[in-house]
Curated annotation (Swiss-Prot):
Catalytic reaction annotation: L-lysyl-[protein] + O2 + H2O = (S)-2-amino-6-oxohexanoyl-[protein] + H2O2 + NH4(+)
Bound cofactor: record note: Contains 1 lysine tyrosylquinone.
Enzyme class: oxidoreductase
Protein name: Lysyl oxidase homolog 2
Alphabetical UniProt keywords: Basement membrane, Calcium, Chromatin regulator, Chromosome, Copper, Disulfide bond, Endoplasmic reticulum, Extracellular matrix, Glycoprotein, LTQ, Metal-binding, Nucleus, Oxidoreductase, Repeat, Repressor, Secreted, Signal, TPQ, Transcription, Transcription regulation
Biological process terms in GO annotation: collagen fibril organization; endothelial cell migration; endothelial cell proliferation; epithelial to mesenchymal transition; heterochromatin organization; negative regulation of DNA-templated transcription; negative regulation of stem cell population maintenance; negative regulation of transcription by RNA polymerase II
Domain of life from the UniProt record: Eukaryota
Annotated function: Mediates the post-translational oxidative deamination of lysine residues on target proteins leading to the formation of deaminated lysine (allysine). Acts as a transcription corepressor and specifically mediates deamination of trimethylated 'Lys-4' of histone H3 (H3K4me3), a specific tag for epigenetic transcriptional activation. Shows no activity against histone H3 when it is trimethylated on 'Lys-9' (H3K9me3) or 'Lys-27' (H3K27me3) or when 'Lys-4' is monomethylated (H3K4me1) or dimethylated (H3K4me2).
Phenotypic consequence of residue 644 to Q: Inhibits secretion
Length: 774
């Protein structure tokens, strides 16, 4: 039944009247971010909580989740705990998400939907207005006062959009010996000209900020353990001795301002704020007694190999790690990633049970970084593959390697959703100041501009977009502290901003992806050559906090491989799509056949965001044979190589349609090929290419019997950004006798040590009972 127009209009107006004040109240409680649309992005400083509010940390945990959602866990009084869902609201969820660096909350969940937590239930009957600076400022029953069980643990779903410039405060500011003394700001101030001219700063006075004044710490009770903690905070793995005579002479020339307390560290702390307060220093400026006639405390730090100082001399005693038994994978920055350990020649992960800053710091120092600023849990830096080597690690902090720590070799109850990671302190190199993005719609995108020296002056200019790719964009985003690259643009249509920077000053850029800065990549130097020229051909990037990570199921390839002699009259689609070897053109179409090496491939997305094709819908290609669109022309390579690495046959699969075939647990499928659907692979899902579909093969009709290597490479041209490209290659040993084929030892590249990998490539026998080893 139709209603009169007036009735509709009145209802709408009434609804607007009800919603308007609610919307205004809601928006009034949110912080405003006008700077989000300005360049450059200022560093975000979280609103200060009242002095009487407890200092806490938050994290999201649980299984089957994205990085921006999970069970809410609170670190308070030295212990992680959960929050009860009683009286929880979207306003409280907003506070949680903003405290974790997300712009807002999308929703919240009750009844332990992300699994039951452990430890105390810190907060119950929580009431927030939505404008609190921290969850601790909301009203509740009090810390630990609850009648809830862990079946009522609350969870939140935050927006993927990050607050621009947000910086995590990863170290809890400890109240030293219950006094109102907080060591929040500390620095190493280079005193000698030798160190003032070098980056990073590795030697100088240790200074603490008291109010607005920087003050020195008296060395009367200063120890090497204190120095170790300070060096670790600033990204250095250890400390060393220094020339005291020079500093005595320098200190005698000027009056010092001393902090009235000393520190007492054990050397295992991740931050000096965790150290105890030492004896109070006797200071009496009226009687000219300062620091009990001592000197300002000095530290001299040992740099990791990656961060050895610039200059022709370099440091001969720079920290050089031995053959690594530990590595980091999947991180956006140097010194960040999922922890992987080498055991019995095979790389495996670490379970996050009992994972803490002390153990994480051992890993960081072992790799040549400083102490850990965060012990990452819940596979928030992506899931690994292979075995879980270590569980329930408990380090004292003095170990040289994580394998020296106590641990449980049994990993029962652990899975890769619990892979541990680290974020290490790294030295401040000042590299962010030499690069900027201009003209973007937000701080995470724009035209790349570099600061270079020309004719004795520093000038800003563009980077030539010719041959610019995702690997180069990755280096830019990392240098700027903006995470991973999501897109690399060879042409940019951004607002040009500073007209003085419209000149191309860098060209021919080629990066390996591991460089600290764009300047460390190969480029043309001052011999700039950019044939296309023009402002629109300046290189551009779009950055993202997260990235996907594709991994092939090697076991499935090994289990599903077989040979098929397929008649030519059944290969018409394959001929049209050029999926056969060149000799197929001479094969009789009525009586001839082709010998096909067939297999299934299952490609998982183990990363922290969805894998999306580079091209938009407008560039997808329709395939009549398959009756759907293909979104990526080159998604995987299938190659058969001889033992010298020479290609003897290859798959010619023309292009690919990406979709979610299956997903883990309760993860929802988002992509499908049918009906011109959206294409991609959701985080936690996989795309299955069955052995019986067209072009899922390698044509080996012309290949003679022998021993070979079978190789599959995902995303071979790096068209789409991933958090880890090292696991995109799968290799198998294969033996073909002219009638049958055996596939064995299939594994992902980088799964084994270099020594084991060499043995694999030169071993000519099978490891199963189908054929005897030679």
């Amino acid at each position: 039944m139709e209603r009169p127009l007036c009735s509709h209009l009145c209802s709408c107006l009434a609804m607007l009247a009800l919603l308007s004040p609610l919307s205004l109240a809601q928006y009034d409680s949110w912080p405003h971010y006008p700077e989000y649309f300005q360049q450059p992005a200022p560093e975000y400083h979280q609103p200060q909580a009242p002095a009487n509010v407890a200092k806490i940390q938050l994290r999201l945990a649980g299984q089957k989740r994205k990085h921006s959602e999970g069970r809410v866990e609170v670190y308070y009084d030295g212990q992680w705990g959960t929050v009860c869902d009683d009286d929880f609201s979207i306003h409280a969820a907003h506070v949680v998400c903003r405290e974790l660096g997300y712009v807002e909350a999308k929703s919240w969940t009750a009844s332990s939907s992300y699994g039951k937590g452990e430890g105390p239930i810190w907060l119950d009957n929580l009431h927030c207005t939505g404008n609190e600076a921290t969850l601790a400022a909301c009203t509740s029953n009090g810390w630990g006062v609850t009648d809830c069980k862990h079946t009522e643990d609350v969870g939140v779903v935050c927006s993927d959009k990050r607050i621009p410039g947000f910086k995590f405060d990863n170290s809890l500011i400890n109240q030293i010996e219950n006094l109102n003394i907080q060591v929040e700001d500390i620095r190493i101030r280079a005193i000698l000209s030798t160190y003032r001219k070098r980056t990073p700063v590795m030697e100088g006075y240790v200074e603490v900020k008291e109010g607005k004044t920087w003050k020195q710490i008296c060395d009367k009770h200063w120890t090497a353990k204190n120095s170790r903690v300070v060096c670790g905070m600033f990204g250095f793995p250890g400390e060393r001795t220094y020339n005291t005579k020079v500093y005595k002479m320098f200190a005698s020339r000027r009056k010092q301002r001393y902090w009235p307390f000393s520190m007492d560290c054990t050397g295992t702390e991740a931050h000096i704020s965790s150290c105890k307060l030492g004896p109070q220093v006797s200071l009496d400026p009226m009687k000219n007694v300062t620091c009990e006639n001592g000197l300002p405390a000095v530290v001299s730090c040992v740099p990791g190999q990656v961060f050895s100082p610039d200059g022709p001399s370099r440091f001969r005693k720079a920290y050089k790690p031995e053959q690594p038994l530990v590595r980091l994978r999947g991180g956006a920055y140097i010194g960040e990633g999922r922890v992987e350990v080498l055991k019995n020649g095979e790389w495996g992960t670490v379970c996050d049970d009992k994972w803490d800053l002390v153990s994480a710091s051992v890993v960081c120092r072992e790799l040549g970084f400083g102490s850990a600023k965060e012990a990452v849990t819940g596979s928030r830096l992506g899931q690994g593959i292979g075995p879980i080597h270590l569980n329930e690690i408990q380090c004292t902090g003095n170990e040289k390697s994580i394998i020296d720590c106590k641990f449980n070799a049994e990993s029962q109850g652990c899975n890769h959703e619990e892979d541990a990671g680290v974020r290490c302190n790294t030295p401040a190199m000042g590299l962010q100041k030499k690069l900027r993005l201009n003209g973007g719609r937000n701080p995470y995108e724009g035209r790349v501009e570099v600061l270079v020296e020309r004719n004795g002056s520093l000038v800003w200019g563009m980077v030539c977009g010719q041959n610019w790719g995702i690997v180069e964009a990755m280096v830019v985003c990392r240098q700027l502290g903006l995470g991973f690259a999501s897109n690399a643009f060879q042409e940019t249509w951004y607002w040009h901003g500073d007209v003085n920077s419209n000149k191309v000053v860098m060209s021919g850029v080629k990066c390996s992806g591991t460089e600290l800065s764009l300047a460390h990549c190969r480029h043309d130097g001052e011999d700039v050559a950019c044939p296309q020229g023009g402002v629109q051909y300046g290189a551009g990037v779009a950055c993202s906090e997260t990235a996907p990570d594709l991994v092939l199921n090697a076991e499935m390839v090994q289990q599903t491989t077989y040979l098929e002699d397929r008649p030519m009259f059944m290969l018409q689609c394959a001929m049209e799509e050029n999926c056969l070897s060149a000799s197929a053109a001479q094969t009789d179409p009525t009586t001839g056949y082709r010998r096909l090496l067939r297999f299934s491939s299952q490609i998982h997305n183990n990363g922290q965001s969805d894998f999306r094709p580079k091209n938009g819908r407008h560039a997808w290609i329709w395939h009549d044979c398959h009756r759907h669109y293909h979104s990526m022309e080159v998604f995987t390579h299938y190659d058969l190589l001889n033992l010298n690495g020479t290609k003897v046959a290859e798959g010619h699969k023309a292009s690919f349609c990406l979709e979610d075939t299956e997903c883990e647990g309760d993860i929802q499928k988002n992509y499908e090929c049918a009906n011109f659907g959206d294409q991609g692979i959701t985080m936690g899902c996989w795309d299955m290419y069955r052995h019986d579909i067209d072009c899922q093969w390698v044509d080996i009709t012309d290949v003679p019997p022998g021993d070979y290597l079978f190789q599959v490479v995902i995303n071979p041209n790096f068209e789409v950004a991933e958090s880890d490209y090292s696991n995109n290659i799968m290799k198998c040993r294969s033996r073909y006798d002219g009638h049958r084929i055996w596939m064995y030892n299939c594994h992902i590249g980088g799964s084994f040590s270099e020594e084991t990998e060499k043995k694999f490539e030169h071993f000519s026998g099978l490891l199963n009972n189908q054929l005897s080893p030679q």
